[in-house]
């Protein structure tokens, strides 16, 4: 059976404040695949994610973006979200006065509303949420805290992945989920990501370092530099990068 492409990017060029930041990007992620994008600071990794998510500061000047054959190039962020695009932030924000449980239930009920289903009350939602808490190694005390307030880096990342699971996205985009984590938190987050891969979640992950790939083995690795994808391969590409550094990529593409 032919695999469906969840994300297709064709000849994409984009700018911010009239400055072109992405140049002729081509990318295809098929059903159940996990792709990783790496690159030095300023290479265009985060810009690509923001363009996929529909950030209003970024303008597509050429090319197309498709999610399961639906053209989202000019779609609003809300429309992209409704089509199943989830973007996890590198630094999840803290919101004082917003209970974590209420926020998560609002996320889930919004998804149900789009499907024409009634809202779940707190007890009904807890039945849905409990096994997901186990999946991401979070206990129910997290539910009674303000959103991300006082959370460690690892707790913030797990909480965001929890939001992702509740959203049931077609494509989950994670911006440096390993950022600021110690080795134990990195292992914990990697374990959660691998559990989701086993459940056939399609993911695009941005990372600056190779450490995450010691625990998560992607289907493809893409290297970006100066707003372009300059190399594509499997995880051995990341291993070479760790050994030789980004200067090796610059030399090999010159």
UniProtKB/Swiss-Prot annotation:
Molecular function per GO: ATP binding; ATP hydrolysis activity
**PANTHER family given in the database record:** ABC TRANSPORTER I FAMILY MEMBER 6, CHLOROPLASTIC (PTHR43204:SF1)
Q: Which UniProt keywords apply?
A: ATP-binding, Chloroplast, Nucleotide-binding, Plastid, Transport
What name does this protein carry? Answer: Probable ATP-dependent transporter ycf16
Q: Which family does the entry's similarity section mention?
A: Belongs to the ABC transporter superfamily. Ycf16 family.
| GO terms under cellular component | chloroplast
What domain of life?
A: Eukaryota
Q: Which InterPro entries match?
A: AAA+_ATPase, ABC_transporter-like_ATP-bd, ABC_transporter-like_CS, FeS-cluster_ATPase_SufC, P-loop_NTPase
- Domain ABC transporter residue range list: 7-251
Record's subcellular location? Plastid, Chloroplast
Q: What are the disulphide bonds in this sequence?
A: none
Task: Determine if Nucleotide-binding is one of this entry's keywords.
Answer: yes
Kindly list the positions annotated as binding ATP: 39-46
């Amino acid at each position: 059976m032919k695999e469906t492409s969840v994300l297709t990017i064709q000849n994409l060029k984009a700018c911010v404040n009239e400055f072109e930041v992405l140049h002729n990007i081509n990318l295809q992620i098929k059903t159940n695949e996990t792709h990783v994008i790496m690159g030095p600071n300023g290479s265009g990794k985060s810009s690509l994610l923001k363009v996929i998510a529909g950030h209003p500061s970024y303008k597509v000047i050429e090319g197309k973006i498709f999610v399961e054959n639906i053209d989202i190039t000019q779609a609003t962020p809300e429309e992209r979200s409704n089509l199943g695009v989830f973007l996890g932030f590198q630094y999840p924000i803290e919101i004082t006065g917003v209970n974590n449980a209420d926020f998560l239930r609002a996320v889930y009920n919004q998804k149900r509303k789009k499907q024409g289903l009634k809202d779940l009350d707190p007890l009904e939602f807890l039945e849905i949420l409990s096994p997901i808490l186990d999946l991401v190694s979070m206990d129910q005390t997290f539910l009674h805290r303000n959103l991300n307030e006082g959370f460690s880096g690892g707790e913030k990342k797990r909480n965001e992945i929890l939001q992702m699971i509740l959203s049931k996205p077609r494509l989950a985009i994670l911006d440096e989920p390993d950022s600021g984590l110690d080795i134990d938190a990195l292992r914990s987050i990697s374990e959660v990501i691998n559990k989701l891969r086993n459940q056939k979640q399609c993911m695009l992950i941005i990372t600056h370092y190779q450490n995450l790939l010691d625990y998560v083995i992607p289907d493809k690795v893409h290297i970006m530099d100066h707003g372009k994808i300059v190399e594509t391969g499997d995880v051995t590409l990341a291993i070479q990068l760790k050994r030789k550094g980004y200067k090796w990529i610059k030399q090999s593409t010159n």
